[in-house]
Amino acid sequence: MTFAKISQAAYYVPSQVVTNDDLSKIMDTSDEWITSRTGIRERRISQSEDTSDLASQVAKELLKKASLKAKEIDFIIVATITPDAMMPSTAACVQAKIGAVNAFAFDLTAACSGFIFALSAAEKMIKSGQYQKGLVIGAEVLSKIIDWSDRTTAVLFGDGAGGVLLEADSSEHFLFESIHSDGSRGESLTSGEHAVSSPFSQVDKKDNCFLKMDGRAIFDFAIRDVSKSISMLIRKSDMPVEAIDYFLLHQANIRILDKMAKKIGADREKFPANMMKYGNTSAASIPILLAECVENGTIELNGSHTVLLSGFGGGLTWGSLIVKI
């Protein structure tokens, strides 16, 4: 039987660093105000690179690490809420930029859960036996959709991309998963609203591209629903919580990680964090964190670690995977 494994991880972030002090010069905020509430100290902001540019850098690095040619890739999935355009897909742009002539490519939109949803879908595709190698990338240029006059959202987000190479393997690595959506609460986090508009419509409404968030509702959702889902998944696995080596969670807020560790009953030291440097990068946050953990030696891609990956955000969406990495 064919299974899927994560064989490589890579990330790329824009070079421009925007600190909390930088933000305090253009809005009513301060380093202390932002850090005490979120843990975020700085973020990367793109100056000219679009989402496909960031994702392509990740794709090239994955190929380099694996000593593969682009033509050997079977598929490319890009999880994003900030595509270059609605058409062509960002994934198709990546396919063209790296020369993956044999790959089919598509985008997946599930906000901050996007990488988890994409990884779950890609694993099934490899497991079908029809595909051998795929790139799964989370990439965002959130600075495109931020209202820079709104300090409640502008201080939170950053730009970046991360991804993995998924390959066929004879051993099982993806052990358990739990994927959820609740559209009835979707108004808590929105962006990119396009009004119905034509010479034949009678709707008097304008487009609104900016991201809007009910911060308290999203915070409560993460602590209540997501931590419950993670606990239920661990119980479903018949593993003790201690058997999970690392919890790689979406990097939204340091206080969410603190509270989730307590709710789950896990050692807080097993929850690495990097939102201090990058802010909330939505679909890119988990793969960036994974790639950094591999880079610094915390995690080795040799199947020796049991890792729980979990994303949560707009939709509402949330999902977790227990993976041997």
Curated annotation (Swiss-Prot):
Q: Which residues form the active site?
A: C112, H250, N280
* Keyword entries, A-Z: Acyltransferase, Cytoplasm, Fatty acid biosynthesis, Fatty acid metabolism, Lipid biosynthesis, Lipid metabolism, Multifunctional enzyme, Transferase
Does the keyword Cell wall biogenesis/degradation belong to this entry?
no
The UniProt catalytic activity note for this protein reads: malonyl-[ACP] + acetyl-CoA + H(+) = 3-oxobutanoyl-[ACP] + CO2 + CoA
Quaternary structure annotation from Swiss-Prot or TrEMBL:
Homodimer.
**Which cysteine pairs are covalently linked by disulfides here?**
none
Know the name of this protein?
Answer: Beta-ketoacyl-[acyl-carrier-protein] synthase III
* Main location per the UniProt record: cytoplasm
Recorded GO molecular functions are: 3-oxoacyl-[acyl-carrier-protein] synthase activity; beta-ketoacyl-acyl-carrier-protein synthase III activity
In the record, the note on similarity to other proteins reads:
Belongs to the thiolase-like superfamily. FabH family.
Please state what the annotation says regarding this protein's domains: The last Arg residue of the ACP-binding site is essential for the weak association between ACP/AcpP and FabH.
Q: Where in the cell is it found?
A: Cytoplasm
Pull one GO CC term from this UniProt entry: cytoplasm
Annotated region (ACP-binding), positions in chain:
251-255
Its function, per the record, reads: Catalyzes the condensation reaction of fatty acid synthesis by the addition to an acyl acceptor of two carbons from malonyl-ACP. Catalyzes the first condensation reaction which initiates fatty acid synthesis and may therefore play a role in governing the total rate of fatty acid production. Possesses both acetoacetyl-ACP synthase and acetyl transacylase activities. Its substrate specificity determines the biosynthesis of branched-chain and/or straight-chain of fatty acids.
Give the InterPro entries listed for this entry.
ACP_syn_III_C (IPR013747), ACP_syn_III_N (IPR013751), FabH (IPR004655), Thiolase-like (IPR016039)
